[in-house]
Amino acid sequence: GTVFNTVGSDILAILCRQIGIPLYVLTPMIKVDTRPVYGYNRLSPMPFDYGPRLAGAWDMEAKERVDFRGIKLLEIAPEYIRSLITEKGIIPSSAFFHEAMEYARFLEEV
């Protein structure tokens, strides 16, 4: 049930928990990453260089004075998530691991 999402999603998750509003995450099952089960470790949080996107037209001298490094995706722990809404239905975060592994097996058969 762990989710990786854009910057600010972590703050929203904490806020929702604090004020008692359930957090739902929309995601297609195809985005589920089961590689960690097999030993692959994903970097968390994911670093990202925003320079090309934010300062593509800047002159080089101006670009060199600004640090554009940031984080692209942050981890949101399952305890902050009520359920994930997918094409397979609404899945509680506590049940998502089982559904993800089932979906991964389905993809291997296709």
Q: What spans do the regions from the language model cover?
A:
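Conserved phosphate- and dinucleotide-binding cores of soluble alpha/beta proteins
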Residues: G1-E109
